[in-house]
A protein has these predicted regions:
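Extreme N-terminal regulatory/targeting segments of RNA polymerase sigma factors
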Residues: 1-59, 63, 97
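Promoter-recognition and DNA-melting modules of sigma-like transcription initiation factors
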Residues: 66-106
C-alpha cells in the first residue's frame, strides 16, 4: 500500500518509471497511469466510434489496451511508454470495431 505522501512522490515519476512499478503489481501506480492516459483514450474513442460501437465501449477497450501496454512495454524497444501505449490502445479499439462488424454480419 502506498501512503498519501508516497502518492505525491509518484506523480513526479515518468510514465516509464510508473510502468516499472506497475509491473510489480502496485494498483495505485496503475491507477495513476490510467488517469494520465484517460484523456488520450477518450480522444481515440471519440475519433474511432462507429455505428456498431459507441465511444464508451471503445474507451473500455482502450483501457484494456492500456493494461496490455503496461504488461508488455520494454524500454529497450526505443519508444516512449506513451507512444507504445497509444499504439496498443488504438490496435485494441480497431480490433473491437472489426469484431463488432463481423458479429453484425453473422
Amino acid at each position: 500500500m502506498i501512503s498519501p505522501g508516497d502518492r505525491s512522490d509518484l506523480t513526479a515519476l515518468s510514465d516509464e518509471q510508473l510502468v516499472r512499478l506497475a509491473g510489480k503489481g502496485t494498483e495505485e501506480v496503475f491507477g495513476l497511469l490510467v488517469s494520465r492516459c484517460a484523456p488520450m483514450i477518450q480522444q481515440q474513442a471519440l475519433r474511432l466510434r462507429r455505428v456498431s460501437m459507441d465511444a464508451e465501449d471503445l474507451a473500455q477497450e482502450g483501457f484494456v489496451g492500456l493494461l496490455s501496454a503496461v504488461r508488455t512495454y520494454r524500454e529497450e524497444g526505443g519508444a516512449s511508454f506513451r507512444t507504445y501505449a497509444a499504439v496498443c490502445i488504438r490496435n485494441r479499439m480497431l480490433s473491437a470495431i472489426r469484431q463488432a462488424g463481423s458479429d453484425e454480419a453473422a
